[in-house]
């Protein structure tokens, strides 16, 4: 992937959208289906032509761009919980890259679930369950774990739990993409203004 600021911002928007949806499901028991499909399908978009295509187009991650715009508004992100989810996934991605066995399990598993998704033609409960299982067998083996806050009734519901884990896996996918596009943690501190400007430009272009 081309290492440009706009590509990094698109990938970060994917991460922001995934973590936002995790919280919505954890707290409300539901989330926007279109927003969810865009980021979850990114897990399967290994051979996309460009970064926007990973999510099906910039317009599919408008929610993530809006959240990213708000999070970059000041030196400290206004939404500490979403920032914590994102920071934990960024840390876990580094650890995953350093664990070849888990990484290979993840790659093989994604290919298998991708075939299932193509067979069903949709992201049904079986696809979400298999993505959740893959997350548990790979990313969940690393520390720290992503501690999701929410209503116990939603968190203990198996359908919701599967969707949350699938979205966390999608978040990892966005972090991998961000790294491939030249993303570095220091840029989150020192390029905030430039990234926010780019997020707003992308939002306007997706109208």
Curated annotation (Swiss-Prot):
**Where located?**
Cytoplasm; Cell inner membrane
Membrane topology, from the record = Peripheral membrane protein
Looking at the keywords, is Transferase present?
A: no
List UniProt keywords, sorted A-Z.
Cell inner membrane, Cell membrane, Cytoplasm, Membrane
Return the Gene3D superfamilies for the record. HflD-like
SUPFAM superfamilies, alphabetically?
A: YcfC-like (SSF101322)
Looking up InterPro entries in the UniProt record yields: HflD, HflD-like_sf
What would be one Pfam family of this protein?
Answer: DUF489
For whether the record's keyword set contains Cell inner membrane, the answer is yes
Q: Identify the GO cellular component terms for this protein.
A: cytoplasm; plasma membrane
Family in the record = Belongs to the HflD family.
What is the protein name given in its UniProt record? High frequency lysogenization protein HflD homolog
């Amino acid at each position: 992937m081309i290492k440009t600021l706009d590509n990094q911002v698109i990938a970060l928007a994917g991460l922001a959208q995934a973590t936002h949806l995790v919280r919505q499901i954890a707290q409300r028991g539901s989330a926007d289906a279109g927003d969810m499909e865009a980021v979850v399908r990114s897990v399967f978009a290994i051979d996309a032509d460009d970064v926007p295509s990973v999510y099906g187009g910039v317009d599919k991650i408008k929610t993530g761009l809006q959240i990213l715009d708000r999070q970059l508004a000041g030196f400290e992100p206004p939404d500490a919980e979403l920032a914590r989810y994102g920071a934990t996934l960024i840390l876990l991605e580094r650890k995953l890259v350093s664990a070849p066995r888990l990484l290979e399990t993840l790659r093989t598993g994604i290919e298998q679930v991708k075939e299932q998704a193509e067979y069903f033609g949709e992201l049904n409960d079986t696809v979400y369950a298999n993505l959740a299982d893959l997350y548990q067998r790979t990313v969940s083996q690393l520390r720290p774990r992503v501690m999701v806050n929410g209503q116990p009734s939603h968190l203990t519901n198996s359908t919701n739990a599967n969707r949350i884990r699938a979205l966390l896996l999608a978040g990892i996918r966005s972090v991998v993409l961000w790294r491939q596009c030249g993303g570095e943690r220091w840029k989150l501190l020192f390029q905030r203004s430039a990234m926010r400007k780019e997020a707003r430009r992308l939002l306007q272009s997706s109208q």
